[in-house]
Amino acid sequence: MARLQKIYNDQVVPALVEKFGYKSVMQAPKLTKITINMGVGEAIGDKKILDNAVSDMEAITGQKPVKTLARRSVASFKVRDGYPLGCKVTLRGAKMYEFLDRLINVALPRVRDFQGVKGNAFDGRGNYNLGVKEQIIFPEIEFEKVDKIRGMDINFATTASTNEEAKALLEAFNFPFKKQ
C-alpha cells in the first residue's frame, strides 16, 4: 500500500468525517484518478518529437502513455483528422498515490520561485487542475537528455461534490496551496 493511501485511510478520512459531519465514512471524498496530459503541437512536422514526449511521460508516471489524436482537420494549423498531437496517462490506485506523493514532496518544491499552487483552479464539481510549465521538475527526467522543455496538465478527479470538500481533501494530503 502506498504511503499516502495509508495516510488517507488512517488520518484523512476521520478528519474529513469530523469536519463536514458525514454520517458514514463512505461519504468522505476520495481521489479517484489523476490524469496527466501533454500536448505536443510541434509533433505535426516531426513524429520523433512526440516519441520523446511519450518517453518523458513514461519515466515520470511509470506507465505507458496513450497518444492523443486530432479530432478534426484544421487547415490553418496544418492538422488532419487522426494526427497524433499529444499523449496522456490516467493513474489510479497505488500508482496514483505514489505519483501524488512524488509531486507534492519532490517535484513541486523544485519549481523556481515556488510559492504554492493556486487554490482557485477547481471546476465546481470537486476536481482540481494544475498546469506544470516544465517536465524537468521531476527527478526521473535527466536534464541533459531533454530535447525541449514541455509543460503538462495534471487533473485530480475526486468524489467530492463541492470545491470546499475537494480542497479540504487535497490540503489533508499537504498539498501546497498559496496562503491567501
From Swiss-Prot:
What family does the database annotate? Belongs to the universal ribosomal protein uL5 family.
Its job:
This is one of the proteins that bind and probably mediate the attachment of the 5S RNA into the large ribosomal subunit, where it forms part of the central protuberance. In the 70S ribosome it contacts protein S13 of the 30S subunit (bridge B1b), connecting the 2 subunits; this bridge is implicated in subunit movement. Contacts the P site tRNA; the 5S rRNA and some of its associated proteins might help stabilize positioning of ribosome-bound tRNAs.
Q: Which GO terms describe its cellular component?
A: ribonucleoprotein complex; ribosome
Protein's name according to its UniProt entry? Large ribosomal subunit protein uL5
Q: Which PROSITE patterns match?
A: RIBOSOMAL_L5 (PS00358)
Supply the gene name: rplE
Q: Which organism is it from?
A: Hydrogenovibrio crunogenus (strain DSM 25203 / XCL-2) (Thiomicrospira crunogena)
Q: How does it assemble?
A: Part of the 50S ribosomal subunit; part of the 5S rRNA/L5/L18/L25 subcomplex. Contacts the 5S rRNA and the P site tRNA. Forms a bridge to the 30S subunit in the 70S ribosome.
Record PANTHER family? 60S RIBOSOMAL PROTEIN L11-RELATED (PTHR11994)
Q: Which Pfam families match?
A: Ribosomal_L5 (PF00281), Ribosomal_L5_C (PF00673)
Q: Name one GO biological process term.
A: translation
**What are the entry keywords?**
Ribonucleoprotein, Ribosomal protein, RNA-binding, rRNA-binding, tRNA-binding
What the entry lists under InterPro entries is as follows:
Ribosomal_uL5, Ribosomal_uL5_bac-type, Ribosomal_uL5_C, Ribosomal_uL5_CS, Ribosomal_uL5_dom_sf, Ribosomal_uL5_N
Give GO MF terms, alphabetically: rRNA binding; structural constituent of ribosome; tRNA binding
